[in-house]
Amino acid sequence: MKIIDDPQEFQRIMAARNRIAASQRALSRKWISDTRVFAMAAEGIVHFVDDEYKLFADAFCAEAPGRLFGVSNEDGPPGWDHAVMVEQSTEDEFEQLETEFYGQYFLLFSEDERHAVLFTQAGYKLIAGPLSFLHRFFPDLSSQKREFLEFKNEELSYRHTVGYEQALETAVRFMNWLD
């Protein structure tokens, strides 16, 4: 993994990040439909539960193209944002990526992959990537969709912000698209 320290390359990567992530607090339609997205976990990989981490690491190692960019996505002071390039799809690179963005909201993306979108039930995380990547993460997408619908119905049984409710509905629309 290499930290991007060339200012022009960094600006190009951050411009792509900004197109992909319209906001760190909302799942906008622009973000969700952008074809450059590879993978994102809303609170960072460290918050995965049960066997999600292993599934994600295995899928990353098997499916990640040779050149991915990881960028922080925080509203921090100037200079807080940083980017790295993942050069190899190995478990060591995956662990380095986790360390680099420990506890941060971050995006991992490739500029040449058509994406699909999947929301995990546990902890409301978003996973996006090529369909083959998602099939490694959840071999039975129909089952995952049913689980998510149950989760959505339970969540909407009490009050949430409109944005959260819209994000849940957006997730269902994209899961319908996948199915």
What are these regions (language model features)?
Residues M1-K125, G129-D179:
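Structured alpha/beta or helical-core interaction and ligand-binding surfaces enriched in interleaved
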